[in-house]
Amino acid sequence: AVRLTNEYIGSLPSRKGKKEEYIIRNYDVGTDTISHVFTVAMPGDKGMVNLMLENNAKFSDKEQLALNIWGQMLRNRLFAIVREQESATYGVNVEANSITFPYRKATMMIGFETQRDKVERMKEMIYKELDRSQHELFTQEELTPILVSIKLSRSQAEENIGIDYWMNVLNTYAEYGEDVTDHSDKLLEGMTVEDVRDVVWKFLKKVKVRDWVIKSEEADPLSDWEK
């Protein structure tokens, strides 16, 4: 990245221009927990659950990777519980993410659709698994397939590296001074279940919870001709 920057970007003619000023606006709400149930008119017996956990702490590159891995392991656990054991939904969406610009934030999003009367029980199970993630280690059997999958995805991506990839590398180096091609494989090789548990503990220690539920209105048992 350094060589490419010096040889190509650095060799482009430049001119003194106007320094752009901008304001970063963060619309986050300071309240730790926001929970609400919306009842709306829509067909079917539906209860849509959307949980978002947010933490504004600083996470290292290794911790960000561990956070992503935790999201994948949690997805597998919740799928086994909510779908396979409880038959309460077709699937569970779990996504962990972190950003450093325009402001720092790590998030964990969990969403699924079930029946109205199963919403609270399924939510209890999810919160129980979040707490379990914080206090108990995942097993190596849960971690290994995810590490293999990430390595395979990266290997396949490297076979199709194009200009977009290198532009992203150069942009990251220019903005943050980081060479993202250097260390990701090393972080992956050294990842342990203890690393995952540690980042879960850090993330959940001071987390904001956004708990939204959308339920369909209960159907009127009387048909139109009976009213």
State what each model feature region is.
Residues 1, 59-62, 222-223:
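Short helix/loop capping segments that flank catalytic or ligand/cofactor-binding pockets
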Residues 1-7, 208-209:
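Non-catalytic, conformational "gating/processing" segments within enzyme and secreted inhibitor domains
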Residues 4-18:
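Glycine-centered hinge/linker elements that transmit conformational signals in sensory
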Residues 10-14, 75, 130-132:
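C-terminal, active-site-flanking charged/polar segments
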Residues 17-77:
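His/Glu-based metal-binding/catalytic segments typifying zinc-dependent metallopeptidases
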Residues 37-39, 80, 95-98, 184-186, ...:
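Generic recognition of flexible, low-complexity loop/linker segments
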Residues 45-66, 70, 83-190, 208-215:
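M16 family metallopeptidases and their MPP-like homologs
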Residues 189-227:
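In a subset of proteins, long, contiguous C-terminal domains/tails are tracked
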